[in-house]
């Protein structure tokens, strides 16, 4: 007889920039029965999900569907499908995840041109536009919301410049989709990649993407169908194409599954699609602008409490993400010890950071289902208590009052 017990995980208040707490309604649909990937009931769910993703990304693109895998899988699928060896790719970098784009692009043979700025700031769009005109890249790829630094980048002028210069504009919107405005068509974004485990409050395991006909044309020129399922017509029509390097991330083959052809590629992650559909449904049910305002509101309360405690926010405030708050670790305080005590004593998880910011800041997420008043008040109370135990010179008793002031003022304004 086995002594192994059934799995039972602890309850946590997750206030990181991802993953975040999963909405209970999403967890519920994940327990519904699995159906076959070609069952009309399932293909109907696929079609519904595509339609809802178009609303989420604010686009009329034909192609809006998820990649099975983490957010990074979505990023790699898009880049793998458009980059060919020796393509010039311009990547503006203002944090860790800009460097990730360079890692992926280089592995697919691109000539990568990096444009870097100080972590905690963003670029003047004109600096990027000048570089686009100078480099004349095939692709400009950049991050919309950089969770490593808590900054968000304006995209509209860059998208317009890319269209004028005939460069494909590919945007990592993993951390912003569902929590911040992402206007794919208006900002002239050619391809965008979202994440499930952040503002959508869905477990990690799918990456919603969308792309327009400019990208679809590049993919079509590289289209292949696997030998084991290709028809004679497929082989004749596609024989001269240079295939996309990756099989799993070949968007031309995934299009055949997500279109009327329903040609098999890989076994669909059924319960993850249920989860994504429900997560996006909840976003649209709340309403995009209402949801974005909720994130701004709770972030304002959190920031007010942090500052009232006597702590400093990190980075340029003019480009702060409304879903991630970066806090400078006070001098003489062990940041990891504070995080450990928060988790052990309060069940609260906040994040550290990476690279030049490792050991210098904490990152607190207010994303999706985790973005609630009770969570904001709880993390402020817990952080204050732990810092006092660490003999930090903070203003005791002021954080919660400052956050409550934000909530009460908002309530009074709503009543007017």
From Swiss-Prot:
Effect of residue 264 to S: 9-fold decrease in transamination activity
Domain of life, per lineage: Bacteria
PROSITE patterns: AA_TRANSFER_CLASS_5
GO biological process assignments: allantoin catabolic process; glycine biosynthetic process, by transamination of glyoxylate; purine nucleobase metabolic process
Keyword Plastid: no
Reactions listed under catalytic activity: (S)-2-ureidoglycine + glyoxylate = N-carbamoyl-2-oxoglycine + glycine
EC number(s) from the headed UniProt entry: 2.6.1.112
Effect caused by changing residue 37 to H: 5-fold decrease in transamination activity
Pathway annotation from the record: Nitrogen metabolism; (S)-allantoin degradation
Entry keywords, A to Z: Aminotransferase, Purine metabolism, Pyridoxal phosphate, Transferase
Induction info: Expression is very low in excess nitrogen (glutamate plus ammonia) and is induced during limiting-nitrogen conditions (glutamate). Expression is further induced when allantoin is added during limiting-nitrogen conditions.
Pfam family, one: Aminotran_5
Cofactor(s) named in the record: pyridoxal 5'-phosphate
Chain positions found as N6-(pyridoxal phosphate)lysine: 198
GO molecular function: alanine-glyoxylate transaminase activity; L-serine-pyruvate transaminase activity
Purpose of the protein: Catalyzes the transamination between an unstable intermediate ((S)-ureidoglycine) and the end product of purine catabolism (glyoxylate) to yield oxalurate and glycine. Glyoxylate is the preferred substrate, but other amino-group acceptors can be used.
Protein family (similarity comment): Belongs to the class-V pyridoxal-phosphate-dependent aminotransferase family.
Subunit structure: Homodimer.
Name assigned to this protein: (S)-ureidoglycine--glyoxylate transaminase
Organism: Bacillus subtilis (strain 168)
Lineage: Bacteria, Bacillati, Bacillota, Bacilli, Bacillales
């Amino acid at each position: 007889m086995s002594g192994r017990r059934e799995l039972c995980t602890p309850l946590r208040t997750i206030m990181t920039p991802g993953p975040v707490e999963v909405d209970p309604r999403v967890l519920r649909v994940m327990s519904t029965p699995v159906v076959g990937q070609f069952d009309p009931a399932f293909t109907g769910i696929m079609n519904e999900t595509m339609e809802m993703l178009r609303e989420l990304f604010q686009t009329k693109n034909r192609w809006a569907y998820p990649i099975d895998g983490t957010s990074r899988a979505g990023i790699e699928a898009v880049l793998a499908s458009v980059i060919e060896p020796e393509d010039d790719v311009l990547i503006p970098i203002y944090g860790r995840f800009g460097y990730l784009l360079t890692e992926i692009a280089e592995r697919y043979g691109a000539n990568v041109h990096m444009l870097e700025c100080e972590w905690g700031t963003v670029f003047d769009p004109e600096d990027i536009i000048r570089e686009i005109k100078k480099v004349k890249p095939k692709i400009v790829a950049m991050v919309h919301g950089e969770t490593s630094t808590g900054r968000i980048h304006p995209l509209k002028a860059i998208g317009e410049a890319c269209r004028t210069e005939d460069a494909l504009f590919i945007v990592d919107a993993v951390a912003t989709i569902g929590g911040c405005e992402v206007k794919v068509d208006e900002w002239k974004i050619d391809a965008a990649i979202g994440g499930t485990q952040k503002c959508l409050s869905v477990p990690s395991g799918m990456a919603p993407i969308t792309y327009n006909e400019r990208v679809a044309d590049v993919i079509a020129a590289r289209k292949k169908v696997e030998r084991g399922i290709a028809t004679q017509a497929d082989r004749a029509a596609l024989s001269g194409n240079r295939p996309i390097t990756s099989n799993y991330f070949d968007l031309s083959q995934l299009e055949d599954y997500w279109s009327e052809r329903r040609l098999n590629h890989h076994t669909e992650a059924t319960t993850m699609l249920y989860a994504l559909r429900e997560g996006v449904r909840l976003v649209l049910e709340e309403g995009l602008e209402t949801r974005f305002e909720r994130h701004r509101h709770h972030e304002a309360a959190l920031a007010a409490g942090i500052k009232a405690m006597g702590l400093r926010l990190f980075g340029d405030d003019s480009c702060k993400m409304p879903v991630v708050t970066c806090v400078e670790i006070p001098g003489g305080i062990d940041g990891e010890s504070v995080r450990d005590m928060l988790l052990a004593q309060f069940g609260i998880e906040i994040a550290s950071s990476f690279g030049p910011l490792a050991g210098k800041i904490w990152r607190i997420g207010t994303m999706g289902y985790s973005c609630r008043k009770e969570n904001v008040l709880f993390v402020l109370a817990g952080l204050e208590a732990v810092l006092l135990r660490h003999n930090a010179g903070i203003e005791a008793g002021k954080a919660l009052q400052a956050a409550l002031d934000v909530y009460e003022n908002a309530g009074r304004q709503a009543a007017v």
